């Protein structure tokens, strides 16, 4: 609702929309909490919930690592990306810093199809880093559920994103989103603040690869060096309500 009042996003209607901004309110989409429920999901390796994810979620990571041919190690920082592979999704930012992103501690699992340049980009990196990158150039709902349950973090560096659903699903599975502050991503992900231990994800403002990598590295620091704070952030994310009932109530 705020972005469409700007010249960049307003498509010529920004003046009218700005004049009537008091009449507008953005309402985000919802997700099906029955379909996306780690406690009952039959598509994941091991079920879990907010009370026991500390002891059970990692099993999903190890099993997915084994299935995809990655190095099996629960201590690896697994980042998931489930997306249409298009310019909108910020994939050029990933390309610019990929060699720094997938260090010895990090794995990236990609699921999606789209523009050939990005499909081939991820295929190349999977060839270059076979133990660290898994490029699944397809869409498999079963595999997507497994990744939501297995990953530690979920990357969405979108150029623009009117709402977005995958960050909501990742919250549901205790997977921490790393997003660019645009559209619905800004509305749904509250940036982590280490000073008051608040927030439920990580975000960066500018469409800039180095800024994105800096935030990813910061998230890894919290994951490895401040595990209690990380788990508390997961708790807050899983407690969010992005069901359709919540969206209906706001409407």
Residue ranges and their predicted role:
Residues 1-251:
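Catalytic cores of nucleotide-sugar-dependent glycosyltransferases that transfer UDP/GDP/TDP-activated
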